[in-house]
């Protein structure tokens, strides 16, 4: 069951209290492109986080190791989601697969201790804001919300499109300019009343305006931006899913282009070479693609997988979340921070 990040100016969290709608972008263009040679020098992302210098993309069949301290206790099944790394700490959402999908935000420190930070949170995907707070895609109130990590207070950013609540906001990517791109499938729609007539990918401008990026992907899930912020990636579609790329010009997403077929896609991460790390939930693996959609590597885990983020001292540790578990693997390339 698939369930399902860039700096966010503080102003957007205090201003985006209402939203209006725009028409969806044009349908995807399915033309192919000839993949160029894989780069070996890391680019610098839009926020300046990627280090310059040599980098090596993963290749072949790899396996991530489970972080035992993060294992969920025996009992009701749980799903970990939306990992973000900051100041030596991994934060992620942890929700129960039961009525209402009750959720909390967990903190996994460098000392290996797992602590509950905020409960309840109603959260799924997470992103780090400029002021150190967390931006969360939530299903309890069907909104994007801002959480203060010190006092746990919550503030709505946006919660509806054309007068109706979202379905169950799932994952997001935040541009250096403060634009939020997020997916709205129906996986946790039953957590609260109301919803949309379709599942969609949305854009939230810095002025609070909500517009549709794509409504042709069934249950869009993972979403990420290229290091330079000029391409948006979205994965969704279930068993016969798709990884789709959209050029961003003047802050708006253009027609999408299908890069690869993916099975039960969930969350994503991007490295500083621009490679795309797409999880395949019930396939219990992550696949690494170059920006043209050519597969470079697979990373296996031992349970259903949901999402991914880079962290660690040099940002070369890939952390993976899934069914009551967190995994990690060291790579030869740093990640583009979300």
Where are these regions (language model features)?
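C-terminal motif of bacterial Sec signal peptides marking the signal peptidase cleavage site
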Residues: 17-19
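Bacterial N-terminal signal peptides that target proteins for export
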Residues: 1-9
């Amino acid at each position: 069951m698939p369930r399902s990040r860039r700096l966010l100016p503080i102003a957007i969290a205090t201003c985006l209290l209402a939203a209006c709608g725009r028409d969806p972008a044009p349908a995807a263009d399915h033309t192919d492109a000839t993949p160029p040679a894989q780069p070996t020098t890391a680019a610098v992302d839009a926020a300046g986080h990627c280090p310059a210098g040599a980098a090596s993309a993963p290749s072949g069949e790899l396996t991530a190791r489970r972080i035992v301290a993060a294992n969920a206790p025996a009992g009701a099944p749980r799903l970990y989601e939306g990992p973000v790394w900051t100041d030596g700490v991994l934060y992620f959402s942890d929700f129960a697969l039961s009525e209402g999908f009750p959720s909390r935000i967990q903190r996994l420190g460098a000392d290996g201790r797992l602590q509950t930070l905020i409960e309840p949170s109603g959260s799924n995907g997470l992103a780090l804001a400029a002021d150190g707070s967390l931006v969360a895609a939530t299903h309890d109130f069907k909104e994007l919300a801002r959480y203060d990590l010190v006092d746990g207070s919550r503030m709505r950013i946006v919660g509806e499109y054309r007068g109706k609540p979202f379905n169950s906001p799932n994952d997001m990517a935040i541009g250096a300019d403060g634009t939020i791109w997020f997916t709205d499938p129906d996986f946790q729609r039953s957590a609260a009343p109301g919803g949309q007539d379709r599942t969609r990918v949305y854009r939230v401008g810095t002025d609070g305006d909500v517009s549709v990026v794509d409504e042709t992907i069934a249950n869009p899930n993972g979403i990420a931006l290229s290091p330079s912020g000029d391409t948006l990636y979205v994965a969704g579609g279930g068993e016969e899913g798709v990884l789709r790329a959209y050029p961003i010009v003047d802050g708006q997403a253009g027609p999408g282009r299908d890069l690869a077929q993916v099975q039960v896609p969930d969350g994503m991460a991007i490295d500083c070479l621009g490679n795309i790390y797409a999880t395949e939930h019930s396939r219990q693996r992550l696949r690494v693609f170059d920006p043209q959609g050519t597969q470079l590597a697979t990373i296996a885990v031992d349970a259903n997988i949901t999402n991914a983020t880079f962290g660690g001292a040099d940002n070369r540790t890939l952390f993976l979340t899934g069914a009551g578990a967190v995994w990690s693997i060291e790579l030869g390339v740093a990640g583009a921070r979300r």
